[in-house]
Amino acid sequence: MHLLLLHGFTSHPVLTLGPLPERLKEAGWEVRQPALPGHGTRPEDLLKVRFQDWLLAAEEAYLELPEPRGVVGLSMGGLLAAHLAARHPTKALVALAPAFALKNPLAPYLHWLIPRFPGPPSIEDPELRKRNPNYPYFPTRAVLELLALMHKTPEVLPRVKARALVVEAGKDRVVKGVDRYFALLGSPRKDYLVFPESGHDLLLDRDREAVARAVRDWLLASDNYLQ
């Protein structure tokens, strides 16, 4: 199986996925980690991007992979992963803390108040938080594109038929509704895991190795089941 790994909004395209890519490679899978438009450069570049650009970039990267294919997405990447799995043959979908909805009720209005906002508290461990590789701030108008993608996602979730794993961060202070994402998935076989001590960035926080192993083991089991 060939795996596409999708990062989140404001996330570093590679480092935000922590140990996961290496664990997947060790298991024998080919992985690809594209940088979504506006990421891996500077925060202001997000102002040039619409949510359709993220969808298109993810789809292009996905279709370049040989079949059979699977997709793993973190946060916003979990939304993009669902869109891909709804449109194309997919062996497995993994959504890590998918950004079904934002916890901050002011998020839709921030662009009226301030031009930029600090990165959210996504890592609980204070020492690991100091090494957060993601954008330290983001333009508030860019959040509108994330919200637009969130608005489009519930309608595609029932069309997902791939085997699915959804992982919730027990101390997530960024997103909510992970259980709703799971409930709406049309996958006939789907599993749900919770890491109670982890913040939103599951692969950068204190349980990062355990999360990476859990995803690897679930994918191994899925690979064997589907052969």
Language-model features: locations:
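Gly/Ala-rich beta-loop-alpha elbow adjacent to hydrolase catalytic centers
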Residues: 73-81
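Catalytic histidine neighborhood in serine/cysteine hydrolases
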Residues: 182-201
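Catalytic active-site module of serine/aspartate enzymes centered on a nucleophile-bearing elbow/loop
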Residues: 197-227
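Short, surface-exposed "cap/lid" segments of acyl-processing enzymes
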Residues: 1-42
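Active-site nucleophile elbow and catalytic-triad environment of alpha/beta-hydrolase enzymes
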Residues: 139-156
